[in-house]
Each structure stands twice: as C-alpha cells, then as structure tokens.
Amino acid sequence: SNTKQPTPLGGVIFA
C-alpha cells in the first residue's frame, strides 16, 4: 500500500 510520508525537504514521498 502507498502511504504519504513528510520529508525533511518539505515534500512527500510515496512508500
């Protein structure tokens, strides 16, 4: 499943 995680760079990653 894909979950949105906040990144230190100010974006989001789908992992």
UniProtKB/Swiss-Prot annotation:
Keyword Zinc-finger belongs to the record: no
Pathway(s) per entry: Nitrogen metabolism; urea degradation; CO(2) and NH(3) from urea (urease route): step 1/1
Protein keywords: Cytoplasm, Hydrolase
Catalytic activity of the protein: urea + 2 H2O + H(+) = hydrogencarbonate + 2 NH4(+)
Subcellular localization: Cytoplasm
A single GO cellular-component term on record: cytoplasm
EC number from the UniProt entry: 3.5.1.5
Highest rank taxon of the organism: Bacteria
Enzyme class: hydrolase
GO molecular function, one term: urease activity
Biological processes per GO annotation: urea catabolic process
Predominant cellular place of this UniProt entry's protein: cytoplasm
Family indicated by similarity: Belongs to the urease beta subunit family.
Subunit: Heterotrimer of UreA (gamma), UreB (beta) and UreC (alpha) subunits. Three heterotrimers associate to form the active enzyme.
Protein name: Urease subunit beta
Organism listed in the record: Morganella morganii (Proteus morganii)
Name of the gene this protein is made from: ureB
